[in-house]
């Protein structure tokens, strides 16, 4: 029997016009948007799904980076998420958003993925404007509409 997340993922794939996507044996489903934004969905449990945006490698050469990330995380928390987290296996910074499955639709999932993508763009630009670059072979500053972003926003 399929989980609620699997059923939603099937309907989401149909809505956006791709053949089929599914969760792997680790209950993760990863895909790229415009070959720039890497998103992973986690079938965490039957109550919610997690949406992760892969931002890039954690730069260890900038002493202010950790403090800036804490500042950004507070701002995101005050404005409805997503939250910043660290994935030790890939040594990468992620944006994570909890997506409740009650009353979930493909449209709602798409909207919340868009929140994560816009938050990734904003985070990347604010950090870039402070001289901090996340190592990410896919997300290039030239590919994101450039601006003078100095403040974080949650993409909502």
Swiss-Prot record:
Gene3D superfamilies: 1.10.287.390, 3.30.1460.10
Disulfide bridge partners, by residue number: none
Outcome recorded upon mutating residue 151 to H: In strain: RDEC-1, 83/39, 413/89-1 and CK379
Chief place where the protein resides: cytoplasm
Superkingdom of the organism of origin: Bacteria
Gene Ontology terms describing biological process: protein secretion by the type III secretion system
Keywords assigned by UniProt, alphabetized: Chaperone, Cytoplasm, Virulence
Cellular compartment(s): Cytoplasm
Pfam families: CesT
Cellular component, GO annotation: cytoplasm
Coiled coil: none
Family designation: Belongs to the CesT/SycH chaperone family.
Function, in words: Chaperone for the type III secretion of Tir. Probably stabilizes the protein, prevents inappropriate protein-protein interactions and aids in secretion.
Protein name: Tir chaperone
Organism, as annotated: Escherichia coli
Recorded name of the encoding gene: cesT
């Amino acid at each position: 029997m399929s989980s609620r997340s699997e059923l939603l993922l099937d309907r989401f794939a149909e809505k956006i016009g791709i053949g089929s996507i599914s969760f792997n044996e680790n209950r993760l489903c990863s895909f790229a948007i415009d070959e720039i934004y890497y998103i992973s969905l986690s079938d965490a449990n039957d109550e919610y799904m997690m949406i992760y945006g892969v931002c890039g490698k954690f730069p260890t050469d900038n002493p202010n980076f950790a403090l800036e990330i804490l500042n950004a995380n507070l701002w995101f928390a005050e404005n409805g998420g997503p939250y910043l987290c660290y994935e030790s296996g890939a040594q990468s910074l992620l944006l994570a958003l909890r997506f409740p499955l009650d009353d979930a639709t493909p449209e709602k999932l798409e909207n919340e993925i868009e929140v994560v993508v816009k938050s990734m763009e904003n985070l990347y630009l604010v950090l870039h404007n402070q001289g901090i670059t996340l190592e990410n072979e896919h997300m290039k500053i030239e590919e994101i509409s450039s601006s003078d972003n100095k403040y974080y926003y949650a993409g909502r």
